[in-house]
Amino acid sequence: MPLTMSQAFIGNFLGNSPKWYKIAILSFLIINPILFFYVSPFVAGWVLVLEFIFTLAMALKCYPLQPGGLLAIEAVAIGMTSANQVLHEIEANLEVLLLLVFMVAGIYFMKQLLLFAFTKIITKVRSKILVSLMFCLTSAFLSAFLDALTVIAVIIAVAVGFYAIYHKVASGKDFSAVHDHTSESNNQLNNSELESFRGFLRNLLMHAGVGTALGGVCTMVGEPQNLIIAAQANWQFGEFVIRMSPVTVPVLIAGILTCLLVEKFRIFGYGAKLPDAVHKILCDYAAHEDAHRTNKDKMKLVIQVLVGVWLIAGLALHLASVGLVGLSVIILTTAFNGITDEHALGKAFEEALPFTALLAVFFAVVAVIIDQHLFAPVIQWALSYEGNTQLVIFYIANGLLSMVSDNVFVGTVYINEVKAALIDGQITRDQFDLLAVAINTGTNLPSVATPNGQAAFLFLLTSALAPLIRLSYGRMVWMALPYTIVLSVVGVLAIETGFLEQATQYFYDSHMIIHHSAKDVIAPLTSH
């Protein structure tokens, strides 16, 4: 029986999403104008924000760009905000968009070097605790300079490679044979060995994922929202690192200790060992690759190392805007490694562009929040407190929202509201700087709780690797739990005890940072 037009419409709308989800989005699109025109723009605005958070929380049912984008288009169409205000938000955050477009693409051309490094870690180090620590710390270091999505993408590529090699050899084939490593019907595989290997890979990926959060919070380029916060506060790379350090350094130490403890006591699904047979296969493969590496291949790795040095130096010394440094990475690696085909270049941009488009939709929702003054009551309540209590409230408020929503969205909303409070004279510039630290750390650290909060976790969960190693949503939340508790508590204690305030005062006295004026925040506003 042929489909009716209405059935065909529902079938096409949002593709393979569940029917209930499609009906929910259509209902939102019908309800919002009614609320806006006949109830209250303020109520309609809050409903839109909750609907948008819902699309982020349901990211596994449907990528949020389409449902979130429809809601944003309707919001502009009915007058909740204007297209000019959306453009203004995008202009103000152009650096973030450039970071996502160029930096992620740039690192795509450095994958060989990163794959080489992680392969050596797994094959040369036999201690599981040491391997876990190295993955966590390496991810943290890389994420301080690179986008967390990029770092996770590299580690996923490493894990898929290892899984494919083991599956191929255990199935009785040699390294060069063509083989489907996703097949579950192979009887030659040792099931207990395979399960142990899956557990081992799950452990490493979770340690690496948390590592990206530990490192990402430390610098202004570690996460997209850091760049937004740094731009609003008018901080450079070095100042951002120094201002965050009273919270980020204790949290980093606590994160490393958590990594050691969960591995040592084999709790929360950690402690899986790499079977000897699997280790031998991986070592044989690494030796095979080393033996067949030509001078041309070696030269490519040398070029990638040199470009990596430029990348870190360029960011640390703020020699150019982050996106432009990323563009230079693309040009240098492709020029000197001979990647000149247009299609080969295009693949590098596939990873980041959907998220870049989604970020533009975030800014449309931020424009609604600004025009309808949605967060004003919450911010006023938080600002009614003083000193450390105010900082703690902002940290917790950011943390709770970041657990269920995307942290770029949360960070952008809160820093905009605090900036408005500074411009209105409700807070001093020094308090604004402390609040920016609380917002940045509150947005980044508790968000490891669920894949909804960390884009890198969501990327991992939706990857082709997750079903192969049996990594489900629930398992990710369970394995992230010890980190969530430790990072959140240590972060809040660093603020609540007054350590952040005291350390910041010491930095002022030592002339490591300077007192800024409120004009530094207002100036970027008037320049658009």
Curated annotation (Swiss-Prot):
GO-annotated cellular components: plasma membrane
Taxonomic placement: Bacteria, Pseudomonadati, Pseudomonadota, Gammaproteobacteria, Alteromonadales
Record InterPro entries: Na+/H+_antiporter_NhaB
Entry coiled-coil feature ranges: none
Origin: domain of life: Bacteria
Keywords: Antiport, Cell inner membrane, Cell membrane, Ion transport, Membrane, Sodium, Sodium transport, Transmembrane, Transmembrane helix, Transport
The protein, known as: Na(+)/H(+) antiporter NhaB
Catalytic activity from the UniProt record: 2 Na(+)(in) + 3 H(+)(out) = 2 Na(+)(out) + 3 H(+)(in)
GO molecular function, one term: sodium:proton antiporter activity
Segments passing through the bilayer: 10-30, 63-83, 96-116, 131-165, 204-224, 240-260, 305-325, 359-379, 391-411, 449-469, 476-496
Membership in a protein family: Belongs to the NhaB Na(+)/H(+) (TC 2.A.34) antiporter family.
Chain's role: Na(+)/H(+) antiporter that extrudes sodium in exchange for external protons.
Membrane topology field: Multi-pass membrane protein
Pfam family, one: NhaB
Compartments reported by the entry: Cell inner membrane
